Amino acid sequence: MQLNNLKPAAGSKHAKRRVGRGIGSGLGKTAGRGHKGQKSRSGGFHKVGFEGGQMPLYRRLPKRGFTSLTKAFTAEVSLRDIERLEAAEVDLLVLKQAGLVSDLVKSAKVIKAGELTRKVTIKGLGATAGAKAAIEAAGGQIAE
């Protein structure tokens, strides 16, 4: 086998359909577009979501919710992530250096996902009730 002998598998390649090239091709005259109407004309397509002048679905349904402006600046950190860290004291700077949170993050919260088996001190981070209990059960503490 050599590179110049390679061929695509049989039936895997199809010739491009040439439309408007005579009736014998099966796609002559109207080129598969039918007769008259907007879709038969050049440039004759409507924008996505247009329903022929009827009030479109995206405008019939009510607006819901909003985009939180603080979402990009807050983060969640699991006990599993903290367990992997070498540090005995964990604060926002340690999390950023470890790549667990983005540099944009201004506050983080520890959530109870995974287990903590060693003593660790959490500084300046929030924690859920379950996470607090798990940290204290492992001999650690949460300093505000």
Curated annotation (Swiss-Prot):
Q: Does the keyword rRNA-binding apply?
A: yes
GO terms (BP aspect):
translation
List the Gene Ontology MF annotations in alphabetical order. rRNA binding; structural constituent of ribosome
Gene3D superfamilies tied to this protein: 3.100.10.10
What InterPro entries does UniProt report for this protein, alphabetically? Answer: Ribosomal_uL15, Ribosomal_uL15/eL18, Ribosomal_uL15/eL18_sf, Ribosomal_uL15_bac-type
Q: Is rRNA-binding one of the keywords?
A: yes
**Spans annotated as Disordered:** 1-48
**Keyword annotations from UniProtKB, A to Z:** Ribonucleoprotein, Ribosomal protein, RNA-binding, rRNA-binding
Could you tell me where the Gly residues compositional bias lies? 21-31
State the function annotated in the UniProt record.
Binds to the 23S rRNA.
Q: Which PANTHER family match?
A: 50S RIBOSOMAL PROTEIN L15, LARGE RIBOSOMAL SUBUNIT PROTEIN UL15M
Subunit arrangement? Part of the 50S ribosomal subunit.
Question: What is this protein's record name?
Answer: Large ribosomal subunit protein uL15
Higher taxonomy: Bacteria, Pseudomonadati, Pseudomonadota, Betaproteobacteria, Burkholderiales
Q: Which gene encodes it?
A: rplO
